[in-house]
Amino acid sequence: MAHTVKKLLIANRGEIALRVVRTAKEMGISTVAVYSEQDRNSRYVDMADEAYLLSGDTYKDTYLNEDLLIDILRKTGSDAVHPGYGFLSEVPSFAQKVEDAGACLLYTSPSPRDSTSS
């Protein structure tokens, strides 16, 4: 089933987040960026339609904090998440939480689903 994305949460940082913001804007999709204190002045943060600070000192507290990202997903009304690469892009529990929140996870193969299940 096709899903039309209207608002995209970008759950990553740096160059990948910038590329996703640019592409989404070209497609007419509203963007939501997340950032840590160290990324506050990054270009992707300025280019996004909305941006939310991830409080914390470690990646575990920020970009790997599944529940915090799902809260932002819900708060912003985003209907899709682009995880970029690394961080949560291959974490089955995050994919399930995104789905449970009524949004879709955009990713490329291989799937972040558990490859051990048949």
Predicted regions and their residues:
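ATP-binding N-terminal substructure of ATP-dependent carboxylate-amine bond-forming enzymes
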Residues: 1-106
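Conserved small/polar residues in nucleotide/adenosyl-binding loops
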Residues: 107-113
